[in-house]
Amino acid sequence: MTKSFLFLISLSFIIFINCQENYEMLNLKNFEWKNRVLIIGGDSSKFKSQLDQINLESNEFTDRDLVIILIEKDNSRISYDGLKTIKSIDYDSTLNLRNKYNFKEFKLILIGKDGYEKYNSKKLVSINVIYELIDGMPMRKQEIKERN
């Protein structure tokens, strides 16, 4: 084998590894008992409007251990800090989420720390409604009690 061939193989491997690091493999089970998950998906103007609202009012997401997953047509992203930083999710995880929750049109789903769906809406939802839903959960009440 020539040196240039070995160089190309090495370079291809490095590029492959770097590309893999930009995507996060996602399994919702990994969030159980650690985080609440807000999944927003669909391909519509409602999707953008919901994100705009979250961007304005997401400062309390980390206090509520809330992770946001954004599902779009062929691309999904995740944020652990109220959309301040966003990481892409791998394609297989995107397909799994789209199929599991049937994201053909706009939808917002809230999943509790126990892994169960707590709220599901096809309409825009005020972030304060999400906060109220979370704050009414027994586990959240216990968290608030322990912090005080």
Predicted regions mapped to residue ranges:
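Non-catalytic interaction/Regulatory regions outside core domains
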Residues: T2-F5, F16-N148
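Repetitive helical segments and hydrophobic/amphipathic motifs
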Residues: L11-S12
